Design a protein with these regions (language model features):
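Extreme N-terminal tail/first-helix region
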Residues: 1-18
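A short, polar/proline- and glycine-enriched secondary-structure boundary/capping micro-motif
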Residues: 54-60, 76, 104
Length: 131
């Protein structure tokens, strides 16, 4: 489903950010830049419990992500999808992994009482202007 010419945006070494668009409970849109990973089938998103992202993803609201090329923001891929999985298990390890991807070190600050949660988003539609 991912266009071959745009696959590089999902690779670890590209370090592309995604812009996650969600619909809040009251129907208003919200967009957040995020770190992400790709397991070949799902986009992996990590957040802390009770944050805006967590509340919207937990409701299984449809999502959209724009992933621009880090070197040319006019080249991008848009992914629309659905949340298929949510777990707190391994949540802190996942944010450490993402910290390593984007900052080169696994050591992510652990905040007292913070619970990390990982979501898997399955793409349902993919659009790209990369040829």
């Amino acid at each position: 489903m991912i266009p071959q010419a745009a696959e590089y945006l999902l690779k670890w070494e590209t370090k592309a950010f995604a812009y996650l668009a969600l619909t809040l409970k009251d129907g208003t849109p919200q967009v957040t830049p995020i770190w992400f990973d790709w397991d070949g089938t799902h986009l992996i998103i990590n957040t802390a419990r009770r944050r805006v992202k967590d509340k919207a993803l937990h409701r299984r609201a449809p999502v959209a992500l724009a992933i621009p090329d880090p070197h040319d923001a006019y080249r991008y891929m848009q992914i629309r999808g659905v949340v298929e999985d949510e777990t707190e298990e391994g949540g802190y390890d996942m944010i450490c992994r993402l910290n390593e991807k984007y900052h080169g070190q696994r050591d992510y600050p652990k905040r007292p009482g913070e619970v990390r949660v990982t979501y898997k988003v399955r793409p349902t539609q993919v659009f790209s202007n990369i040829r």
